[in-house]
Swiss-Prot record:
Residues 51-58, 122-140, 221-237, 294-320 are cytoplasmic. Odorant receptor. It comes from Homo sapiens (Human). The keyword Disulfide bond applies. This is Olfactory receptor 2C3. It is found in: Cell membrane. Belongs to the G-protein coupled receptor 1 family. The gene is OR2C3.
Length: 320
């Protein structure tokens, strides 16, 4: 008769993180905190500008307002726990906290994959079908695409995370990372995880490979349309319209490909932690800078908002 293992769920997980390099923890704390503050401030400004400036009430900026909210939520699901572990001697996270962390991070990561593909379709419609753009990207479609992105990400997170949470865990409760990821939780299971792995590969295909394919096809059509534009000014405007999105897609998918789609032996586990640190902390902070520095409309709206607030405050002081 087969012996039944002790499969009680642990009350806490130990996040080893960067504990093997204690000399780096203080430096990493300062760096991570700085990037986190920049991320919250920058993404918050993008959301505020997108909602307050009527000139930005277009399909492109409707989707753009979703992206910074995603970035803020994603980094907030991971960074506070990371900062606590870097600062103090405790390197633990509760079982419930770990579950919430991988539910939310999986949900928001999948949502961003679909949203970036949706934004590429919006750019395709704007450049390749300019005369029909307002008809194609009508408000109902934009709302439907945004909802599909959020609900699609939520669905795959609910399925994958629930399957992971149902795994009987036994033995070691140490996670050699700085946040809870489903593949690492699966490694702690004492049963066969083939079903979980199959679901993870299927979700990766649907939410990573297919959106990336749509992005590449969209930009293939866009590149062909831009090359047909005769005037240099027209080509420059078309390039500026897409450059911010291309930069964000390159950062996001570049990190994913470098992290997950390489042969296992080509990247050490320690290198993997720093790559994960890049896409969870650095990328969300860079995205608003990319959109403000490379987008004249956002810069103009931001300048207008600052001047309006400054002039309004000066006027009120003068009346007093």
């Amino acid at each position: 008769m087969m012996e039944i293992a002790n499969v009680s769920s642990p009350e806490v997980f130990v996040l080893l993180g960067f504990s093997t390099r204690p000399s780096l923890e203080t430096v990493l704390f300062i760096v991570v905190l700085s990037f986190y503050m920049v991320s919250i401030l920058g993404n918050g400004i993008i959301i505020l500008v997108s909602h307050t400036d009527v000139h930005l009430h277009t399909p492109m900026y409707f989707f753009l307002a979703n992206l910074p909210f995603l970035d803020m939520s994603f980094t907030t699901s991971i960074v506070p726990q990371l900062l606590a572990n870097l600062w103090g001697p405790q390197k633990t996270i509760s079982y419930g906290g770990c579950v919430v962390q991988f539910y939310i991070s999986h949900w928001l990561g999948a949502t961003e994959c679909v949203l970036l593909a949706t934004m590429s379709y919006d750019r395709y419609a704007a450049i390749c079908r300019p005369l029909h753009y307002t008809v194609i990207m009508h408000p109902q479609l934009c709302l439907g695409l945004a909802l599909a992105s959020w609900l699609g990400g939520l669905t795959t997170s609910m399925v994958g995370s629930t399957l992971t949470m149902l795994l009987p865990l036994c033995g070691n409760n140490c996670i050699d990372h700085f946040f809870c990821e489903m593949p690492l939780i699966m490694q702690l299971a004492c049963v066969d995880t083939s079903l979980n792995e199959m679901e993870m590969y299927l979700a990766s295909f649907v939410f990573v490979v297919l959106p990336l394919g749509l992005i590449l096809v969209s930009y293939g059509h866009i590149a062909r349309a831009v090359l047909k534009i005769r005037s240099a000014e027209g080509r420059r405007k078309a390039f500026n319209t897409c450059s911010s999105h291309v930069a964000v897609v390159s950062l996001f998918y570049g990190s994913i490909i470098f992290m997950y789609l390489q042969p296992a032996k080509s990247t050490s586990h320690e290198q993997g932690k720093f790559i994960a640190l890049f896409y969870t902390v650095v990328t969300p902070a860079l995205n608003p800078l990319i959109y403000t520095l490379r987008n004249t409309e956002v810069k103009s709206a931001l300048r207008h908002m600052v001047l309006e607030n400054c002039c309004g405050s000066a006027g009120k002081l003068a009346q007093i």
